[in-house]
Amino acid sequence: MPDRSPLNIRTYSDQTRTIVLDAIRRIVTAECQASGTPRDPDFEIFDHSPATTNDSATTDRVRAAFDAHFGTDRTFDLPLQTASEDFSDIPRTLGIPYTYWGIGGIDPDTYRRAEESGRLGSDVPANHSPRFAPVVQPTIDTGTEALVVAALAWLAPSNPV
C-alpha cells in the first residue's frame, strides 16, 4: 500500500467542499484505525481555488450587452464545470460582484469532428492543457471585443450604474 494518496477535489460550493473534505478525513482516519496503523494519517491541503459563482445582476447586464453586440446566435450559457480557476480570488477578497465568461477559440473542424464522434471531452483540449491551442483569429478579435463590450456595459453614458 502506498504511503500517500493525492486527491483532486472539485466542488461547486465552499459548503460542499467542507462536507467532502470532512468525509474524506473521517473515512481515511477510520480505515487507518481499523487497519491498526501506528499513527493517524496526515492531510495536506494545497492549491485551493474557490468555486466561481457569477453574480446574477452582473451576469445579466454583461450577457445583454453580448447578445446585443454578438447576436443571440453566438452567445449561450456555459454549462456548470468543475474547472480549477483562481479568477474569483480577487473579487471575493474585495467583496465585489463579478461574472466569468468564455469565448470560443477551437478550430471549427476539430470541434465538429470531436462532437460527431462523441469525444469533446477528450479531443478538444481545455484551458491550461498543454495541448490547448486556440486559433489565433478570430479568437483574439472576439476576446478583445468581449472585453470592450463588457466594460461599456458599465462605463458607457447610456448604461448608468
Q: Locations of the language-model features?
A:
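Metal-dependent amide/peptide-bond hydrolase catalytic core
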Residues: 1-161
